[in-house]
Swiss-Prot record:
MF annotations from Gene Ontology: DNA-binding transcription factor activity; sequence-specific DNA binding; steroid binding; zinc ion binding
Protein name: Mineralocorticoid receptor
Record remark on domains: Composed of three domains: a modulating N-terminal domain, a DNA-binding domain and a C-terminal ligand-binding domain.
Pfam families attached to this UniProt entry: Hormone_recep, zf-C4
Amino acids binding progesterone: 763, 769, 810, 938
Gene: NR3C2
Biased composition (Basic and acidic residues): 1-19
Compositional bias segments (type: Low complexity): 259-288
Region (Modulating): 1-601
Chain spans, region Hinge: 668-718
Family indicated by similarity: Belongs to the nuclear hormone receptor family. NR3 subfamily.
Residues annotated as binding 21-hydroxyprogesterone: 763, 769, 810, 938
Length: 977
C-alpha cells in the first residue's frame, strides 16, 4: 500500500541544510533499463514478510543459519506493477559504512544537544551517552559483517491472517516499554500512517520481522513522547538504547534526529540513501526497497513505518519508533499477510495509551479507504519484566462498511468487567462478541417497563385499568436500557417505587385513579372543593359499582399515616371531600365540567348565547339586531353575493347576510308572544278542569272552565280561581298555540343551484309542510266536527293556497318581504328566483308578501286568515256536511271581525280594515291558480324534468289534478268580481 510521511519536527529543516553539505559515496545496485531514470519518483507497494520470533539482545554471536531465519525474505513480485526492484544489494562496505555512520552520529549529537532543552524536564532516567550509542553501532556493524552478502527480496506471498506476540523473554536488560499497534490505516500526505500492500494490520516490519506502529504513547524512563499524529508517542524502542528524539537510522547503524537522508538521485540534498530510493521532499533515509515517506527512514528491506517510525537492520536505538532485527520489545510482531486487526503488542509498564485515533483527514487519491475503529482505552499490564497476559478493557465500534470480520486485541486477551482499569463505554454495540477471543460481559438489559404488582390496579368488575401506560401511551418501541434500583431509563419520567407510598396490602384496588382507554376519568381537584368526575362508557348502564369506592378521606389518611412520606409527594394531594354513594351521574358530570366554557352558543354568529330569543338560541347582540332590522323595516343590501361569513368578529360587516342568517336560524318576532302564552298555558293547566259542557254551534267555541277545588298552589295564590277565569284561552290564543312548526328544507348547498335541484328541494319542503298542515287541521277547533271526506277535500283544495300564504308571512316576518323565506335553510334571493325557472310566479308571491308590509298584519290576523283560507275552496257539488262547514266558516269570520274592531290601531276604521283583509283573501285565489298550473305541469313532466316529488305530495296531486282540471273546484270569494 502507498505510504507517505509527514515531517512535523521543525529541526528537520535545519538538519536538511546540514546534511546537504555531506557527501558520501554510496553503492547503488543495478537497476533495470527502464528503472534507472530519476523520474521514477512514485510510491512503491511492498508486502512485508515478518518472522514471529524476536532476536535477543545477545544473539549477535549466533550461527549464520539462525540469523538467516530471523531475517525477512524480501522477494520481488513481478506481477505487481508497483515494485521496481529486482535484486537488492543490502550490504555496504565496512569502511564506507563506518565512515558514514561516524559522520552521521557526529551531526546527530549536535542536533541532540540543540534539542536537549525540550527534554530536560523529562529526562530523568532515559538519557544515553554517546559512548553507549557507539557501542550499539559497533554491535550493529558486527551483525552486518556476519550477515553480509545476503540479498533480500520483496515478497508478497499471501498468508493467513494472524498476529504475533513477542516472546516473553524478549524484554532485554529489564527495559520497560509500552506500545500499542493500531492498523490498518491509509497513508496520506498530510497525516501518513503505514499500511501494507494488502491492508495489513502491522504498520512496519524490520528485517527481523518486528513491527511497530506510531501514534501511541511510549514511556521512556519517566516521560512519554508523543508522535505528531495522535498525541501519543511512536511506538517501540530498543531495550538497550533509549535515545532521545532519534527519528531515522541509516542502513548501517546511524541515528539521526529528523534529518532527511536521501540518495544522490533524490531531489533532496541529504547524502545517504539506498540506490533505488526516490524520496519525496523532506523524506528521510530510504533503503533500497524503501517506500518513501516524508518523515520515515527504513532499513534496506524495510517497509516504511509511520511518521516517526524507523526500521533499522541493526539494533540502533530510537526513542520514537524502532524495529530492530536483533532484539526488540515492540508491541506486536506481524507477518506480511497478518491482516488481523488491530495488532496489539505486549507492553512493559503500567501506564495507559490514550486516544489512539488515526488522523481524520487522510484520504489519498486512488487509495482504498479502510475504516479504523476508535479505541477508547487500553490497559496493558506486564509484571516482572516479562510480557504477560493482556488485560484490555476496550470498546470498539467498527464502521458499517468495514472489511474486518473481527477485531482482535490479542489471542489470549479477555475482558474483565471487574478490572481496576475498566473504563466506562461510550458506545456499546449489541453484538455478542466485539473481539475474537474476548467477550464483553456487561450488565444485562432489563425491560424498562416492567409490570409491577401494586402499581396497576383494576378499577371495576369490567377490568378497566387505570395505569401509567394508559396515561403516557405505549412504551417506546425498541427501547433498551438498564433499570437498577430506583433509576429509570430516559424513555419516560417514572417515579421511584416506594413501598411505603403504595402499600400493596393496605390500599384497595380502586385507589389509583387516572384515565383509561375506555374514556373513564377520575379527577382530584386541588383544594377543599375536591370532586370526582366519572364518565362511564356506553356499555355501562348504571353506576352500580360506584358504592365500591372507598371514602377519599380514608385514602388520604392512609397516605398520611406514613411519617417518612416526603412533603413533595403530599403537596399534590390535598384533603378531598367525601363523595356520597348515591350520587347521580348527571351531578358528577355537571360538577366536573364546570362553567369554563359556555354550554350554548349563538346559532347566528357563534358567540356565547345569552338565552332563547325570538325562538332561537342567540346572543344579545343578534337579538337586538334582529329586532331592529325587522321592526325598522330596513332594506339591507349585500355588497357581495349574499354569502358573507357571519361570525363573532365579522357579524357587523354585512347586515343583509346577518339578517338572512337570523332568518335561516328560525328567528321570528311572533315567537316572543308564543313563549308568553306558553307560560300562561302551563299555569292554567295546573288547575284541574272538568270536560267542557256540550255546546251548540250558536254558542260558539269560547267558554270559561268552572273553578274547582284549589290545588296545592292555592296556598300561594289565594285568588287563583278568579285569575283562571280571566286566563281562559280565547280562540286567538288557541290558534297561536296550534300554529304549525317551521320545518327545514334540507337544502344541500354543495350541489349546483340548477332548476331541477331547486324544484326538487321545494317539493320535498312542501311535503314536510303538508304533514304539519294536516296536524294543524286536526286540532283546529270545529274542524273535527266535519266528516273525514270533507276534511280531506278541504285540505287537498287549499294546499297550495295555505303554503303560499304561509310563505308570504314568513318572508314578511323574517326578511321584511325582501327575500323568500321558504325555510330557515332555504331563502331565495333574486338570483335563485331566476335559477328556479319560476321567476314570474315568485314575483306574484312577492307582491302578496308586500301586502303584508303595507297592511301591517298581526299574528292574530294571520292565524284567522289562515283558517279562512282552509275553508275557501270546496267542490262544486258541495261537501257532505255543508251546513256544518258553513257554520264553522261563519264563526271564524265573526271572530276575525271582532278582533279587527277591538284592535286599538283600527279604531274608527275597523270596517275598512276588515274589508282590506277580505280583499286580500280573494286575491290569493288568482295567485294559486297560476301556482297550481305550474305544479301540475312539473308533475306531468317529472320524468323529463328530473324533478322529485315526495310520496304524500304525489298522492295529493294525483287526487287533486283531475278535479281541478275538470273545473270541479269552487273558490269562495268575499267580494263579487
Amino acid at each position: 500500500m502507498e505510504t507517505k510521511g509527514y515531517h512535523s519536527r521543525p529541526e528537520g529543516l535545519d538538519m536538511e541544510r546540514r546534511w546537504g553539505q555531506v557527501s558520501q559515496p554510496v553503492d547503488r545496485p543495478s537497476l533495470g533499463p527502464a528503472e534507472r531514470t530519476e523520474e521514477n519518483n512514485y510510491m512503491e507497494i511492498v508486502n512485508v514478510s515478518c518472522v514471529s520470533g524476536a532476536i535477543p539482545n545477545n544473539s549477535t554471536q549466533g550461527s549464520s543459519k539462525e540469523k538467516q531465519e530471523l531475517l525477512p525474505c524480501l522477494q520481488q513480485d513481478n506481477t505487481q506493477s508497483g515494485i521496481l526492484t529486482s535484486e537488492i544489494k543490502t550490504e555496504l562496505e565496512p569502511k564506507e559504512l563506518s565512515a558514514t555512520v561516524a559522520e552521521s552520529m557526529g551531526l546527530y549529537m549536535d542536533s541532540v544537544r540543540e534539542a536537549d532543552y525540550a527534554f530536560e524536564q523529562h529526562a530523568q532516567q532515559g538519557s544515553l551517552s554517546p559512548a553507549k550509542i557507539y557501542q550499539n553501532v559497533e554491535q550493529l556493524m558486527k551483525f552486518y559483517k556476519e550477515n553480509g552478502h545476503r540479498s533480500s527480496t520483496l515478497s508478497n506471498v499471501s498468508r493467513p491472517s494472524r498476529s504475533f506476540l513477542p516472546d516473553p523473554g524478549s524484554a532485554v536488560n529489564g527495559g520497560v516499554m509500552r506500545a500499542m499497534v493500531k492498523s490498518p490505516i491509509l497513508c496520506h500526505e498530510k497525516s501518513p500512517s503505514v499500511c501494507s500492500p494488502l491492508n495489513m494490520t502491522s504498520s512496519v516490519c524490520s528485517p527481523a520481522g518486528i513491527n511497530s506502529v506510531s501514534s501511541t504513547t511510549v514511556r521512556f524512563g519517566s516521560f512519554p513522547v508523543h508522535s505528531p499524529i495522535t498525541q501519543g508517542t511512536p511506538l517501540t524502542c530498543s531495550p538497550t538504547v533509549d535515545n532521545r528524539g532519534s527519528r531515522s537510522h541509516s542502513p548501517a547503524h546511524a541515528s539521526n534526529v529528523g534529518s532527511p537522508l536521501s540518495s544522490p538521485l533524490s531531489s533532496m540534498k541529504s547524502p545517504i540513501s539506498s540506490p533505488p530510493s526516490h524520496c519525496s521532499v523532506k523524506s528521510p533515509v530510504s533503503s533500497p526497497n524503501n517506500v518513501t515517506l516524508r518523515s520515515c527512514v527504513s532499513s534496506p528491506a524495510n517497509i516504511n513505518n509511520s511518521r516517526c517510525s524507523v526500521s533499522s537492520p541493526s539494533k540502533a536505538n530510537n526513542r520514537s519508533t524502532l524495529s530492530s532485527p536483533a532484539a526488540s520489545t515492540v508491541g506486536s510482531i506481524c507477518s506480511p499477510n497478518a491482516f488481523s486487526y488491530p495488532a496489539s503488542g505486549a507492553s512493559v509498564g503500567s501506564s495507559a495509551t490514550r486516544d489512539v485515533i488515526p488522523s481524520p483527514d487522510t484520504h489519498e487519491k486512488g487509495a482504498h479507504e479502510v475504516p479504523f475503529p476508535k479505541t477508547e482505552e487500553v490497559e496493558n499490564a506486564i509484571s516482572n519484566g516479562v510480557t504477560g497476559q493482556l488485560n484490555i478493557v476496550q470498546y470498539i465500534k467498527p464502521e458499517p462498511d468495514g472489511a474486518f470480520s473481527s477485531s482482535c486485541l490479542g489471542g489470549n486477551s479477555k475482558i474483565h468487567s471487574d478490572s481496576p482499569f475498566s473504563s466506562v463505554p461510550i458506545k456499546q454495540e449489541s453484538t455478542k462478541h466485539s473481539c475474537s477471543g474476548a467477550s464483553f460481559k456487561g450488565n444485562p438489559t432489563v425491560n424498562p417497563f416492567p409490570f409491577m404488582d401494586g402499581s396497576y390496579f383494576s378499577f371495576m368488575d369490567d377490568k378497566d385499568y387505570y395505569s401509567l401506560s394508559g396515561i403516557l401511551g405505549p412504551p417506546v418501541p425498541g427501547f433498551e436500557g438498564n433499570c437498577e434500583g430506583t433509576g429509570f431509563p430516559m424513555g419516560i419520567k417514572q417515579e421511584p417505587d416506594y413501598g411505603i407510598y403504595y402499600p400493596e396490602a393496605s390500599i384497595p384496588s380502586s385507589a389509583i385513579v387516572g384515565v383509561n382507554s375506555g374514556g373513564q376519568s377520575f379527577h382530584y381537584r386541588i383544594g377543599a372543593q375536591g370532586t370526582i368526575s366519572l364518565s362511564r362508557s356506553a356499555r355501562d348502564q348504571s353506576f352500580q359499582h360506584l358504592s365500591s369506592f372507598p371514602p377519599v378521606n380514608t385514602l388520604v389518611e392512609s397516605w398520611k399515616s406514613h411519617g417518612d412520606l416526603s412533603a413533595r409527594k403530599i403537596d399534590g394531594y390535598p384533603v378531598l371531600e367525601y363523595i356520597p354513594e348515591n350520587v347521580s351521574s348527571s351531578t358528577l358530570r355537571s360538577v366536573s365540567t364546570g362553567s369554563s366554557r359556555p354550554s350554548k352558543i349563538c346559532l347566528v354568529c357563534g358567540d356565547g348565547a345569552s338565552g332563547c330569543h325570538y325562538g332561537v338560541v342567540t346572543c344579545g347582540s343578534c337579538k337586538v339586531f334582529f329586532k331592529r332590522a325587522v321592526e325598522g323595516q330596513h332594506n339591507y343590501l349585500c355588497a357581495g353575493r349574499n354569502d358573507c361569513i357571519i361570525d363573532k368578529i365579522r357579524r357587523k360587516n354585512c347586515p343583509a347576510c346577518r339578517l338572512q342568517k337570523c332568518l335561516q336560524a328560525g328567528m321570528n318576532l311572533g315567537a316572543r308572544k308564543s313563549k308568553k302564552l306558553g307560560k300562561l298555558k302551563g299555569l292554567h293547566e295546573e288547575q284541574p278542569q272538568q270536560p267542557p259542557p256540550p255546546q251548540s254551534p250558536e254558542e260558539g267555541t269560547t267558554y270559561i272552565a268552572p273553578a274547582k277545588e284549589p290545588s296545592v298552589n292555592t296556598a300561594l295564590v289565594p285568588q287563583l280561581s278568579s285569575i283562571s277565569r280571566a286566563l281562559t284561552p280565547s280562540p286567538v290564543m288557541v290558534l297561536e298555540n296550534i300554529e304549525p312548526e317551521i320545518v327545514y328544507a334540507g337544502y344541500d348547498s354543495s350541489k349546483p343551484d340548477t332548476a331541477e335541484n331547486l324544484l326538487s328541494t321545494l317539493n320535498r319542503l312542501a311535503g314536510k309542510q303538508m304533514i304539519q298542515v294536516v296536524k294543524w287541521a286536526k286540532v283546529l277547533p270545529g274542524f273535527k266536527n266535519l266528516p273525514l271526506e270533507d276534511q280531506i277535500t278541504l285540505i287537498q283544495y287549499s294546499r297550495m293556497c295555505l303554503s303560499s300564504f304561509a310563505l308570504s308571512w314568513r318572508s314578511y316576518k323574517h326578511t321584511n318581504s325582501q327575500f323568500f323565506y321558504f325555510a330557515p335553510d332555504l331563502v331565495f334571493n333574486e338570483e335563485k328566483m331566476h335559477q328556479s325557472a319560476m321567476y314570474e310566479l315568485c314575483q306574484g308571491m312577492h307582491q302578496i308578501s308586500l301586502q303584508f308590509v303595507r297592511l301591517q298584519f298581526t299574528f292574530e290576523e294571520y292565524t284567522f286568515m289562515e283558517v279562512l283560507l282552509l275553508l275557501s275552496t270546496i267542490p262544486k257539488d258541495g261537501l257532505k256536511s255543508q251546513a256544518a262547514f258553513e257554520e264553522m266558516r261563519a264563526n271564524y269570520i265573526k271572530e276575525l271581525r271582532k278582533m279587527v274592531t277591538k284592535c286599538p290601531n283600527n279604531s274608527g276604521q275597523s270596517w275598512q280594515g276588515f274589508y282590506q283583509l277580505t280583499k286580500f283573501l280573494d286575491s290569493m285565489h288568482d295567485l294559486v291558480s297560476d301556482l297550481l298550473e305550474f305544479c301540475f305541469y312539473t308533475f306531468r313532466e317529472l320524468q323529463a324534468l328530473k324533478v322529485e316529488f315526495p310520496a304524500m305530495l304525489v298522492e295529493i296531486i294525483s287526487d287533486q289534478l283531475p278535479k281541478v282540471e275538470s273545473g270541479n273546484a269552487k273558490p269562495l270569494y268575499f267580494h263579487r268580481k
